[in-house]
Curated annotation (Swiss-Prot):
Belongs to the universal ribosomal protein uS2 family. Required for mitoribosome formation and stability, and mitochondrial translation. Keywords: Mitochondrion, Ribonucleoprotein, Ribosomal protein. InterPro entries: Ribosomal_uS2, Ribosomal_uS2_bac/mit/plastid, Ribosomal_uS2_CS, Ribosomal_uS2_flav_dom_sf. It comes from the Eukaryota. It is found in: Mitochondrion. It comes from Mus musculus (Mouse). The gene is Mrps2. CDD domains: RPS2. This is Small ribosomal subunit protein uS2m. Residues 27-52, 264-291 are annotated as: Disordered.
Length: 291
């Protein structure tokens, strides 16, 4: 049955305000101002431009023109990965079928991870992490393993980022505006040191991050599913030596990217006309987030 004319008029005018006595021109409601809708997607990690396009081209676009602007390739080698036991996987019976392309072979019933692929994926993950930290993005370390909780929290604190090593309630990312308010900002990158929880099930945050289009970096063992991880790093996630190596690499990469950002901003202030005229002025303080 077709709706009544009055009901149809209300449906067509939903979300639109009209001023009585003036021209019947629709004015967009609060949810449609500026052509954008209020969503729970994370805010881009690009800071507001300073001095127009010059700041954009010199500071923000320069790292994108180099394949390894932060020299993350020199932080590790295949030998260092081997010495940290990154190549050791689980038993062949626990193997996930999507991890088969990253497995080098099997020895005495234990899967061996191909370290050449691990080094390639690790370089891509560290490079992406450095670019996010360079643009002052929020990085969240996530793990559910109690054995490495203190190490992960210390790593996040050392590089000025955040960590979540306790129980992760489902909906913290998808319903963040309802739980924390409309002004909450979601992380720009989530680093999973373990993609499984205590009962060897996929971590809830992996699924929620995929729903919210939040990029993820994750250490995936031979019993993990790498499909929902944006930058999977095949490697051992149970050995203390391996986790210490990964934490050291992430901490060094983030600190290096932040230091590079401070150097680029200082160089830009010195080269700009305003900086040369007022050399006696105090430098602009770093407004990056602090945990």
């Amino acid at each position: 049955m077709a709706p009544a004319p009055a009901v149809l008029t209300r449906l067509l005018c939903a979300g639109v305000r009209r001023w009585p006595g003036f021209l019947q021109k629709a004015i967009p409601g609060p949810a449609e101002q500026n052509g954008r809708k209020v969503t729970g997607a994370p805010v881009p990690a690009v800071s507001e431009p300073q001095d127009g396009d010059d700041f954009q081209s010199r500071i923000l676009d320069t790292p994108l023109q180099h394949s390894d602007f932060f020299n993350v390739k020199e932080l590790f080698s295949v030998k260092s990965l081997f010495e940290a036991r990154v190549h050791l996987g689980h038993k062949a019976g626990c193997r996930h079928r999507f991890m088969e392309p990253y497995i080098f072979g099997n020895r005495l019933g234990q899967d061996i991870i191909d370290l050449d692929q691990t080094a390639l994926n690790l370089q891509l993950a560290l490079n992406f992490t450095a670019h996010v930290a360079y643009r002052k993005g929020i990085i969240l370390f996530v793990s559910r393993n109690r054995q490495f909780s203190h190490l992960i929290e210390t790593t996040a604190q050392a590089c000025g980022e955040y960590a979540h090593t306790r129980y992760f309630k489902g909906g913290l990312l998808t319903n963040a505006q309802l739980l924390f308010g409309p002004s909450v900002r979601l992380p720009d990158l989530i680093i999973f040191l373990h993609t499984l929880n205590n009962v060897f099930e996929p971590h809830v945050a992996v699924r929620d991050a995929a729903k919210m289009n939040i990029p993820t970096v994750g250490i995936v063992d031979t019993n993990c599913n790498p499909c929902l991880i944006t930058y999977p790093i095949p490697g051992n996630d149970d050995s203390p030596q391996a986790i210490q190596l990964f934490c050291k690499l992430f901490r060094t990469t983030i600190n290096r990217a932040k230091e590079k950002r401070r150097q680029m901003e200082a160089l830009h202030r010195l080269q700009s006309p305003k900086g040369s005229e007022g050399s006696g002025t105090s430098p602009v303080p770093d407004k990056s987030h602090s945990p």
